[in-house]
């Protein structure tokens, strides 16, 4: 009986240890690999500043292209696709938080007009569902359903992201009108260079904080370097810490200047933003246009028939 209790206690302790380890892993890993859309959500009420700049550019410093494709016009209460393309060389590898090389992730923020929102699952067609695959979209804020974020997701699989969007109906939403509206998009590939608190990530260039002579370079056990710089004028020592990832460009005994790069730039990613326009079309206006075109076609047909009839009359009179 005592042996059974002992075995049960050991089993419970092992399960508890595994659970605690898993929780610690999730907490410590999330800010490194899965948190960069959350950085913007936590720090900014609106992802688009008054200047038109999307705040993701504050952390992703390199400028890269992004493209968005939407229909020219949509009818009310209709599901349509907004396709965001984040192009990059799929062979590229980025510096991860631990200093090793790995594949790039991508992410995007889509800023829709007020009233437009993510389409509910029961309104999405099988064709669009196939394009979406396993992607999970979320609102930037519970109160901002027109702003959607996605990522990070594997760039090799999702460099093209399809958002299923539901257009509003002015008949039920009085603040929505049949107009032309702008749509804004931001898309990044790879990790950022700056964290929200202003500190550098290891996906960045590290510069000398002092001029002088590099007197000592210590390679740290877990990667990275400690570089000691001695000021030639007063002998003051400054130690610059380089995290794992960037490649060192200086050597011991080398004379360096203030702000001189100590490392290469490991960043291969970047952020881009773009915009598009979409018209919320009034169905009555479309019907009116179709009727107008139909009337023109009928008028042309009657005109041709009348002309042929007139020609026949003329021909018969000439024969008479």
UniProtKB/Swiss-Prot annotation:
Keywords: Chloroplast, Electron transport, Heme, Iron, Membrane, Metal-binding, Photosynthesis, Plastid, Signal, Thylakoid, Transmembrane, Transmembrane helix, Transport
Bilayer-spanning residue ranges: 286-306
Names of required cofactors: heme
Cofactor: how bound: Binds 1 heme group covalently.
Top-level taxon of the source organism: Eukaryota
A single BP term in Gene Ontology: photosynthesis
Binding sites annotated in the UniProt record for heme: 36, 56, 59-60
Biological role stated in the UniProt entry: Component of the cytochrome b6-f complex, which mediates electron transfer between photosystem II (PSII) and photosystem I (PSI), cyclic electron flow around PSI, and state transitions.
Protein name as annotated: Cytochrome f
Organism in which the protein naturally occurs: Morus indica (Mulberry)
């Amino acid at each position: 009986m005592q042996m059974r209790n002992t075995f049960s206690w050991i089993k419970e302790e092992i399960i508890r240890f595994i659970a605690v380890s898993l929780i610690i892993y999730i907490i410590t890993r999330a800010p490194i690999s899965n948190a960069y859309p959350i950085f913007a959500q936590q720090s900014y009420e609106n992802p688009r500043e008054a200047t038109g700049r999307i705040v993701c550019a504050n952390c992703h410093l390199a400028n890269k292209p992004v493209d968005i494709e939407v229909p020219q016009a949509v009818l009310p209460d209709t599901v349509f696709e907004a396709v965001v393309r984040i192009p990059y060389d799929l062979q590229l590898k980025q510096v991860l938080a631990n200093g090793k090389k790995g594949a790039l992730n991508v992410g995007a923020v889509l800023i829709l007009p007020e009233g437009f929102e993510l389409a509910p699952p029961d309104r999405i067609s099988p064709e669009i569902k196939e394009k979406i695959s396993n992607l999970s979209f979320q609102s930037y804020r519970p109160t901002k359903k027109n702003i959607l974020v996605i990522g990070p997701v594997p760039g090799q699989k999702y460099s093209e992201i399809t958002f299923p969007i539901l257009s509003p109906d002015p008949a039920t939403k009085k603040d929505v009108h049949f107009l032309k509206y702008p749509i804004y998009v931001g898309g990044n590939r790879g990790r950022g260079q700056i964290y929200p608190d202003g500190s550098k990530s290891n996906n960045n260039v590290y510069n000398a904080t002092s001029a002088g002579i590099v007197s000592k370079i210590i390679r740290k056990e877990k990667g990275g370097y400690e570089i000691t710089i001695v000021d030639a004028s007063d002998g003051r020592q400054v130690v610059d810490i380089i995290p794992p990832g960037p490649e060192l460009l200086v050597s011991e005994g080398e004379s360096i200047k203030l702000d001189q790069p100590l490392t290469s730039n490991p960043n291969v990613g970047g952020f881009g933003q773009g915009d598009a326009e979409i018209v919320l079309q009034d169905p009555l206006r479309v019907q009116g246009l179709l009727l107008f075109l139909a009337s023109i076609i009928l008028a042309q047909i009657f005109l041709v028939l009348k002309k042929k009839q007139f020609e026949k009359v003329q021909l018969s009179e000439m024969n008479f």
